[in-house]
Amino acid sequence: IEQTKFPGKIISENIKQFDPRQVSSIDDFIVEEIQGQQGTINAVDYPSIMIVVQGDGLMNQGKTSFQPANVFLIDKQTTIDFQANSNLLAYRAYSVLL
């Protein structure tokens, strides 16, 4: 087990990325912390899983609702917009190995 030893990198207004490949021997995956009242979750080249920790609201122009403990499987190259009633806190992870 390795505790995160780095602060992460802010890649957008709502997303902080934790890429262990920069400081660790772990090179299998990247984790992103998503926060905010509204915003966009950028597409990545890999399928991903996102877990909502807090907040509720709508995604994809109101087509999908979210609330704490929801788990979403996201296809590669999928951009998600969100509008939260209270601040969203979610984590997305994806493997960078093919």
Which stretches of residues belong to each language-model region?
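Extended recognition/assembly regions associated with phosphoester-bond processing machinery
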Residues: 36, 71, 94-98
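Ligand-binding loop in jelly-roll beta-barrel domains
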Residues: 65, 76-98
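Glycine- and acidic-residue-biased ligand/ion/polar-headgroup-sensing regions
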Residues: 36-62
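C-terminal amphipathic alpha-helical segment
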Residues: 1-38
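Short acidic-glycine-tyrosine-enriched beta hairpin
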Residues: 34, 58-81
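Generic structural motif
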Residues: 31, 57-59, 90
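A generic structural signal for well-ordered coil/turn residues at beta-strand boundaries
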Residues: 28-30, 45-46, 68
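C-terminal functional regions that serve as terminal interaction/effector modules
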Residues: 50-51, 71-73, 88-89
